[in-house]
Amino acid sequence: SKILANFTAPYTATPVKRMQEAGAIMLGKVNLDEFTYGSSNESSAFQPSPRNPWKTDRVPGGSSGGSTASVAAGEAPLSLGTDTAGSIRQPAAFCGVVGVKPTYGRVSRYGLIAFASSLDCPGPVARSVKDAAAMLQVIAGADAHDATATPLPVPDYLAGIEDGVKGMRIGLSPDYFRITYPDPVTGELLSQVLPAEIELAVRQAAERLASLGAEIIEDVPMVNTRFGIPAYFVISRVEAASNLHRYDGVKYGHRSDLSTNDLKAMYKHTRHEGFGLQPKLRILMGMYVSAAQYSEQYYRRALQVRTLIRRDFEAAFDPRGKYRLDALLTPTTPTTAFEMAAVYGDSVLMQYADQLTVPANHAGVPGLSLPG
């Protein structure tokens, strides 16, 4: 973001510090959507934005598209991203690399530029599952600087990584093979099946897992998946508006050169000059839906939906329940990587690219995107 263009952080983020202490060599920063607000990388204040290294007329995905593109292009074996609604997993799918959203609280957010604090998760991007596991082993763990970082011991993510899937119960849900989206004219929610090539890829993966000894559990209900994006629209905007208020030009970051003795005018001009379109849209919507007269109608209901989504996952993974899943196999994205500029500018359509990933953020559970 332009508002932090010349900002030098006074301390090192915990995940970065832990990588450095483990001997990692930091090559530099990569580009991303402004404040992570996007699913294509095109909203970055620093242009040109990254392109998909496999097909350069396509987006790398976002918001952590610079992370996934750099790993896919062979510029680095590992990269660090953040995932609020799919921002590691979606670009990992578009770029054909491994992306992990850890359990919420497993990796410290200290030093992270916050988007939606109850959803944000730093995590690894790598060329292989083994590399991703090794990186997560390093960055995970309790942190006195972050009250949301869990104090639970970090498991050995590399132990048993070669054991295979024999005996595992892996679920398929029909609710992940349909996408729900708003009619651009009426606003009515419509539903359609995923493109055949995407469903086929998942079905073939299930067949392969079954051949390796996994038990595939069909028709696992995840009925509240379709409400994930509308709830995310509200929750993330309220939290983003709150987090963005700290950028006012007083102590750090961009400050307007406009001569004025009015503090409010300085705030206004600084934010107008420093924020791009996407932060401005999130501030407006966040302040609107959190206003006293609308909070019950929108924000409270969105939090209730988040609880329903979490219960879907709890029922699916309950060791004493009907399904007793070890994993849920789903598509990562409802489309393949789209062309540059094809979707950018349509904030609603862009957000619906995260429809299949955002439920894991609402539930706080881990998610992994694997290339086909």
Residue ranges and their predicted role:
Residues 30-38, 223-228, 333:
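Short, solvent-exposed turn/loop segments enriched in Gly/Ser/Thr/Pro and often Arg
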Residues 98-200, 204, 259-269:
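A short helix-breaking turn/cap at a secondary-structure junction
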Residues 9-12, 20-21, 25, 198-203, ...:
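Glycine-rich, small-residue loops and helix-cap segments
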Residues 3-8, 120-127, 286-291:
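Short, well-ordered beta-strand elements within core beta-sheets of diverse protein domains
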Residues 1-8, 36-37, 151, 157-161, ...:
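Short, well-ordered alpha-helical
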Residues 89-95:
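Structural signature of FAD isoalloxazine-binding scaffolds in flavoprotein oxidoreductases
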Residues 1-84, 203-213:
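Gly/Ser-rich catalytic/binding loops embedded in alpha/beta enzyme cores
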